[in-house]
């Protein structure tokens, strides 16, 4: 957060890895209160957190609700080998599904630098938690499986807002 008051020749820069909270904004506002009032005039953190919760809270709650209850009779996943492989997307590049510690792992980015464990939900539907800033927000990863019982595509929900989150299996 960068807050400047040129008329008073003062400003503050707050660097924080605190999203989605209002901590950086609260620090800046409290700083200006201290400079101009000599004391904090209100609980800025509570006010900013309420604002951030109103912006991001509904999305987190909706995602949690979508995945909080397993189907009454969930179908088991196929063998990991049905899903493991390289997948390509013209917009996002490559996604690699591999096996790690007995579970499936999604790797994205150059050289697979971002890894996300996939938890099973139902048959070919899995859950990941791709947002470091919002670790409690689940997101779906759904495989499209052909008659050969092998995935030919995977849709990554958090990349699919504009319908561009489906990756096709790359030829080996």
Residue ranges and their predicted role:
Residues 1-172:
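Catalytic loop of the DD-peptidase/beta-lactamase superfamily, centered on the K-T-G motif
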């Amino acid at each position: 957060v960068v807050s400047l008051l040129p008329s008073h020749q003062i400003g503050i820069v707050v660097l924080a890895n605190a999203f989605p909270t209002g901590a950086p904004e609260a620090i800046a506002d409290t700083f200006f209160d201290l400079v101009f009032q000599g004391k904090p005039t209100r609980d800025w953190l509570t006010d900013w957190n309420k604002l951030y919760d109103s912006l991001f809270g509904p999305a987190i709650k909706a995602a949690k609700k979508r995945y909080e209850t397993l189907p009454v009779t969930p179908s088991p996943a196929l063998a990991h080998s049905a899903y493991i492989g390289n997948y390509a997307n013209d917009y996002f590049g490559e996604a690699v599904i591999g096996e790690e510690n007995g579970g499936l792992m999604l790797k994205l980015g150059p050289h697979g630098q971002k890894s996300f464990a996939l938890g099973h939900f139902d048959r070919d539907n899995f859950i990941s938690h791709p947002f470091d800033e919002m670790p409690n927000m689940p997101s779906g990863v759904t495989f499209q499986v052909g008659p050969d019982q092998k995935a030919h595509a995977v849709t990554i929900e958090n990349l699919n807002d504009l319908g561009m989150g489906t990756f096709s299996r790359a030829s080996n």
